[in-house]
Amino acid sequence: MSKICQVTGKVPMVGNNRSHARNATRRRFLPNLQSHRFWVESENRFVKLRLTPKGMRIIDKKGIDVVLTDIRARGEKV
């Protein structure tokens, strides 16, 4: 499964590990993905999303119904 937030669209970034001697080795910075179930009152069911804590705050602010319509408009199946 890809490491992409379903709400914010955050993806892994690439960068360097830096040792004390400033040697650079490539690495990935992964988003803090969490799997969370949300109750959708309009559909009378739970929806499981893979999202970051920022995505959870967006759902708290806008509401799960608005966020789900945005996700479905992008063509993702939820």
UniProtKB/Swiss-Prot annotation:
Keyword terms of this UniProt record: Ribonucleoprotein, Ribosomal protein
HAMAP family from the UniProt entry: Ribosomal_bL28
GO cellular component terms listed in the entry, alphabetical order: cytosolic large ribosomal subunit
Entry protein name: Large ribosomal subunit protein bL28
The organism's place on the tree of life at top rank: Bacteria
GO MF annotations in UniProt: structural constituent of ribosome
Organism (species): Colwellia psychrerythraea (strain 34H / ATCC BAA-681) (Vibrio psychroerythus)
GO annotation (BP), single: translation
InterPro entries cross-referenced by the UniProt entry: Ribosomal_bL28 (IPR026569), Ribosomal_bL28/bL31-like_sf (IPR034704), Ribosomal_bL28_bact-type (IPR001383), Ribosomal_bL28_sf (IPR037147)
Family: Belongs to the bacterial ribosomal protein bL28 family.
